Amino acid sequence: MGYINYPNNVVREFFKQASKYGVDVLCVFNYLDYINNLKLFVDVSSSAGGFVEGTLSYTGDTSDPKKFKCNIDYYIKLTRDLSDMGVHYLAVKDTADILTPCVTTMLVSALRGVLPDMPLHMTFPGSCLSPRSW
């Protein structure tokens, strides 16, 4: 819908109309990974019979052991929380274009270890052309 907070009634009406016109998969995303903000979206979309893709915002180098917040355990916890919330798919969004092939392998392996059967999508808005990948 956008990068702002919407009143609950607007969210509900949006999904009612989206479902009516054939939208059946919704990607929910909070750029700060504050997944409590996604709960209403997941509930409304699921109750309308839709499928929900919960999206993690990749914002830190998980290969750096000095990272205290955005490490592998952080993303594993988010993955479990999204699954418990009821999402049907999982996505990792690399908005900062900082994922390298090595780190992507490490991250995907860790997420697969938690939810081996959940579909996993990767999004690279920067076309996966990070200078760190060269």
Where are these predicted regions, by residue range?
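Alpha/beta enzyme core
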Residues: I4-H121, W134
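Extended, largely alpha-helical regulatory/partner-binding modules appended to the mid-to-C-terminal parts
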Residues: G126-S127
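Conserved thiamine diphosphate
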Residues: M1
